[in-house]
From Swiss-Prot:
Belongs to the putative dsDNA mimic protein family. The lineage of its organism: Bacteria, Pseudomonadati, Pseudomonadota, Gammaproteobacteria, Enterobacterales. Pfam families: DUF440 (PF04269). Coiled coil: none annotated. May act as a double-stranded DNA (dsDNA) mimic. Probably regulates the activity of a dsDNA-binding protein. This is Putative double-stranded DNA mimic protein ESA_01547. InterPro entries: dsDNA_mimic_put, Put_dsDNA_mimic_sf.
C-alpha cells in the first residue's frame, strides 16, 4: 500500500472524522445506558484524544501501523474538563492518508 505524506488528514480532520464515525456507529455497538451516559456527560467531560497507534492494534490488523499514516483516537469521558480520558467508549484506528479509507474500532465492552 503506497501512501503519500503530502496527502494526509490533519490532526483536527482525523479527530473530526473519528468522532463522526463513532457517532454514526455507537447505537449499534454500545449499550443504550452507555449511550445515554455519554450524551449526558459529553459536553462537560467528554473528549477525543489523538495518539500514535498502540501495540494492541497489532493483534487486530495485519499491516504496518506507521504513525506517519495511522492514528488512534480515544473517545470517552474524563473526570473533569481538560483531564485525560479515563472512561473510554471507543478506540478508533484511522488511516490518515486520504486515498486509503481504513478504519477499525474497539468498542467499550
Amino acid at each position: 500500500m503506497e501512501m503519500d505524506l503530502n496527502n494526509r488528514l490533519t490532526e483536527d480532520e482525523t479527530l473530526e472524522q473519528a468522532y463522526d464515525i463513532f457517532l454514526e456507529l455507537a447505537a449499534d455497538n454500545l449499550d443504550p445506558a452507555d449511550i445515554i451516559l455519554f450524551n449526558l456527560q459529553f459536553e462537560e467531560r467528554g473528549g477525543a484524544e489523538l495518539f500514535d497507534p498502540s501495540e494492541e492494534w497489532l493483534s487486530h490488523v495485519d499491516y504496518d501501523l506507521n504513525p506517519d499514516f495511522f492514528s488512534e483516537v480515544v473517545i470517552g469521558l474524563a473526570e473533569k474538563d481538560g483531564d485525560e480520558i479515563t472512561d473510554v467508549f471507543a478506540r478508533v484506528l484511522l488511516c490518515r492518508e486520504k486515498d486509503h479509507k481504513l478504519c477499525h474500532i474497539l468498542w467499550r465492552e
